[in-house]
């Protein structure tokens, strides 16, 4: 995953424009968890769609940015204790293309008021969720079977509308490339890495978790083995589901043309590719200073190139 992450970050850095970048997190209320768990592909896809539409529609409003930004979205479904916690990380450029194909950049911090963002997102998600319900395109597990009843559904929807779906604006980046480096931490993550696992016994698994508040020390979480496996498997995405998606001027269909125009308007590209065209051995050496052709024990050249692989020098 580390190599894939390096390559992904390198590719995205070359797409960074000269503007501030913002990290926005949209989180779904836990009351939706039973419905989410039995409609994963459909409702995760709906989350991607609603986050993107919310950001794009508000950004295009002249009161806020009046332009189409670039957006990278990454879906996560867990928290530090591996509980079901569905949320979307979005990196949003503070600049974009206007309808007359000019560049406009935000001069503020985050350019959309949080309350406006919250209301738009909540309204969109619940309206589209209600459409799926009316079209009978939702599945119901025993834990949410009661929602088949239209009166129960209306009551459920009213409760969701009354909740505060407040998005979180986590970071503002003025160093350009560091926004992508930051998001790179999220793109190739899985629910838990080996480095967090402290011990495994016949009956329990112990692992570290961040403190519940900023500045709190790390804590140890211990779960029965079966519960650890259950929680881990909750975060396996449906086959073929794309957890990383691109919108705005980064949408795949028009990305090359949009970036070419933006770089022309801004006087050049901010960053160049670091690892383009490198073999795996060259990338490992450039990124981590690790030369796989040299024996780590004695320092001698132990391997020689043999096409795309290496052979032992005998």
Feature annotation, model-predicted:
Residues 1-314:
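Beta->alpha loop/short-helix hinge microenvironment recognizer with preference
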């Amino acid at each position: 995953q580390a190599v894939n992450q390096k390559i992904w970050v390198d590719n995205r850095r070359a797409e960074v424009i000269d503007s501030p970048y913002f990290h926005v997190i949209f989180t779904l209320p836990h009351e939706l968890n039973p419905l989410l768990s039995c409609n994963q592909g459909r409702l995760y896809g709906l989350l991607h769609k609603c986050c993107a539409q919310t950001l794009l529609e508000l950004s295009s409003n002249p009161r806020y940015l009046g332009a189409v930004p670039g957006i990278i979205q990454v879906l996560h479904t867990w928290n530090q204790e591996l509980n079901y916690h569905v949320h979307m990380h979005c990196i949003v450029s503070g600049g974009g293309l206007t309808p007359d194909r000019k560049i406009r950049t935000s001069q503020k911090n985050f350019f959309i008021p949080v309350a406006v963002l919250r209301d738009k997102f909540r309204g969109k998600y619940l309206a589209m969720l209600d459409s799926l319900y009316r079209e009978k395109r939702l599945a119901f597990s025993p834990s949410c079977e009661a929602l088949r009843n239209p009166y129960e559904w209306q009551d459920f929807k009213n409760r969701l509308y009354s909740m505060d779906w407040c998005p979180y604006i986590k970071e503002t980046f003025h160093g350009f490339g560091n926004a992508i480096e930051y998001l790179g931490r999220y793109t190739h993550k899985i629910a838990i890495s080996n480095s967090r696992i402290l011990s495994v016994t016949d009956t329990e698994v112990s692992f570290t978790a961040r403190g519940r508040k900023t500045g709190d020390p790390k804590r140890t979480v211990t779960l029965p083995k079966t519960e650890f496996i259950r929680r881990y498997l909750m975060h396996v995405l449906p086959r073929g589901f794309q957890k990383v998606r691109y919108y705005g001027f980064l949408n795949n269909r028009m990305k090359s043309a949009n970036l070419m125009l933006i770089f022309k308007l801004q006087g050049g590209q901010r960053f160049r590719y670091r690892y383009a065209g490198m073999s795996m051995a060259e990338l490992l050496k450039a990124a981590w200073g690790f030369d796989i052709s040299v024996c780590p024990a004695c320092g001698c050249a132990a391997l020689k190139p043999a096409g795309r692989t290496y052979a032992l020098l005998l």
